[in-house]
UniProtKB/Swiss-Prot annotation:
It is found in: Cytoplasm. The keyword Lyase does not apply. Signal peptide: none annotated. GO terms for molecular function: ATP binding; metal ion binding; protein folding chaperone; protein-folding chaperone binding; unfolded protein binding. Belongs to the GroES chaperonin family. Together with the chaperonin GroEL, plays an essential role in assisting protein folding. The GroEL-GroES system forms a nano-cage that allows encapsulation of the non-native substrate proteins and provides a physical environment optimized to promote and accelerate protein folding. GroES binds to the apical surface of the GroEL ring, thereby capping the opening of the GroEL channel. Keywords: Chaperone, Cytoplasm. It comes from Geobacillus sp. (strain WCH70). NCBIfam families: PRK00364.1-2, PRK00364.1-6, PRK00364.2-2, PRK00364.2-3, PRK00364.2-4, PRK00364.2-5. GO terms for cellular component: cytoplasm. GO terms for biological process: chaperone cofactor-dependent protein refolding. This is Co-chaperonin GroES. Pfam families: Cpn10.
């Protein structure tokens, strides 16, 4: 399993099927970049200048919304993931 370092978080992106108002399903080339995902791994947290470690606010299993162009896409064990900093996470859903 991927284990992120520092304040990084591993996300499994949740793809949504996009349709136009008239019900036409858009091809992948016309879709917006996804911004929703599920947290699959969390680093130990951000280290402050004082050396203190600040624990992450998100947990494994959280559904989140993140910045559109944030993170690095990686492929591991046949699946695609996104590794991003906790500061790129905008909200936890639910």
């Amino acid at each position: 399993m991927l284990k992120p370092l520092g304040d990084r978080v591993v996300i499994e992106v949740i793809e949504t099927e996009e349709k136009t108002a008239s019900g036409i399903v858009l091809p992948d080339t016309a879709k917006e970049k996804p911004q929703e995902g599920r947290v699959v791994a969390v680093g130990k947290g951000r280290v402050l200048d004082s050396g203190e470690c600040v624990a992450p606010e998100v947990e494994v299993g959280d559904r989140i919304i993140f910045s559109k162009y944030a993170g690095t896409e990686v492929k591991y064990d046949g699946k695609e993931y996104l590794i991003l900093r906790e500061s790129d996470i905008l909200a936890v859903i639910g």
